Amino acid sequence: MTIDRTKLGSLLVVSLMISGFVLPLAASFGTQPTKTIEFVSSDFTWQTFNRNMNVTTFVSPDGSKDELWHFLQSAEESIYVEIYGVNNPYILELIHELNAVKPTLDMKFLLGWNSLGYPNPNKYVANNLTLLGYPVKWTNSSDFTYAHQKFVIIDNETTIAHSGNWAKTSFPEDGKKANREWSIVMTDVEVTNYYRSVFDYDWGRGTDYDSGTHGTGDPLTFTGDNSTYPRPFADAGEFSGPMNVTPIFSPDTSLQGILYCINSAQATLDIQIPYFTSIGDAGAVDQVVDAILAAKARGVTVRVISEEEKDWLEIEEIFQDHGIPIVWQDTRWFTANHNKGIIVDGRLVLISSINYSDGSITANREAGVIIENEEVAQWYLDIFDFDWGIGDCDAMNEVNVYWSPNIPTSSTTINVTVYAHMLNSTNLDEVSLGVRIGTGAWSNYSIIEHIHNSEEGDLESYSRLLPAQADGTNITVQASIRIGSTWYVGMEMVIRVRNSIGSLPTTTTTTTVDQLMQFLIDWGIYIAAAIAAVILGIVFQRRR
């Protein structure tokens, strides 16, 4: 029997239409409209994006204000802000300027509804922005204990993640004392789409600000303490190239992300965190602490910068018992250590808002990102090393030590520095550096003559060059300072000479596929249904 091709073609079209295929097919190969971000489930799963993208890094107090201003002023279409608190009047002034210069700019603001330290400032900002014509919402009070996240989405292609709020102590004026904070800017549509999906979900569940119900707060103040901090990291880092990017959110993936970082460490693990709490509660923080101790036990050199807050006595004792050095953030130049970051082997870095409390990890909304890129990680590592060298080391008998480079190779001379600033108010009689190569005997070197200026410009740092050692060698160092007949002996630390470090663990990865492959993935089931319908039609025609 001869089949009418016209009828067969019509049958195919009808089958495709029934299967829901024709309209998507037309859209796929026609002009693409601007992509609309879909409202997604609250379960934001772990995704790693392999991207070739641009990244900008900056820190507070050094260059944070200039960089944030630059990116906000660069917005052409939209700015969406999801943040715990705002008390910086200069940021509010900038938004007013943007409103005047770019009146069509789409801006939304999602603020923490019960943010500690920010209830009145947040109400004032919410009322001010509402009067300016922008929509403002509170995060849903039943979703999280605190909405402690700090991220910004610009033009649906750039995401900024902060450890700090939009506060005077996070984005200070020149010459003002402020917190140590890390921030990162990621320019990539796919990565930003992930953050936008979180924003859309939280925004959709948010509560509209109402001045009558919520109040109007108190005007923001411009006061701040002066500082002599020289801002050595005022220049932002600019990086472009391939990198793995993993967005991190509480309560969804924060614990997974923190443990991934710590468990990935093979040579060095550097952690900067405001505090530890929930110690001994058998919760998320205990898992983090256990992972840190396990890293030390498997041969990783661990450093921790924190503050004498919350469970600091407990964590100090735990770390001392396991040979892990901890310093307290310098407060001569900084108001506080408000950073929440991890650097692993100088090649992976976590920038986030996540504190080490069970609530922050499992009950808050928090936001961050893991970047696997050596250049980016090394930029933050330089700042960590700076903070390490000026930290209060009373937990280590007031004697601190470190070296450069962090992970030397077999061809690298190693410069070891003893930091004596805690004891410098008294004349030092002797500074000694103990060195043990591998499992050999200790050698002790007097370095009282090898003195140079500390970061604060005082003659209180002592150094010794160690010759290069074979790949795989572990060099143990221990600094000692004598004042009169009293010796102050620091903790032993291990320099790990490595020409290479093993690859990182594999994670669930999202990559970009070509248009045809993505089309087949999205619509393959409909194509199959259409083909089946055509075959059935042919069989039916033959039977007739």
Name these PLM-found stretches.
Residues 29-41, 390-402, 409, 496-519:
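Low-complexity, Pro/Thr/Ser/Gly/Ala-rich linker/spacer regions in secreted
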Residues 284-290:
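Charged helix-capping and loop-helix junction motifs
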Residues 29-74, 85-263, 290, 298-374:
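HKD-type phospholipase D/PLD-like phosphodiesterase module
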Residues 81-88, 276-283:
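Short, glycine-rich nucleotide/cofactor-binding loops
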Residues 1-37, 418-420, 433, 479, ...:
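Secretory targeting signatures
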Residues 394-505:
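Glycan-association/targeting regions that enable binding to alpha-glucans and other polysaccharides
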Residues 197-205, 370-395, 495-504:
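A recurrent domain-boundary module in secreted/ectodomain proteins
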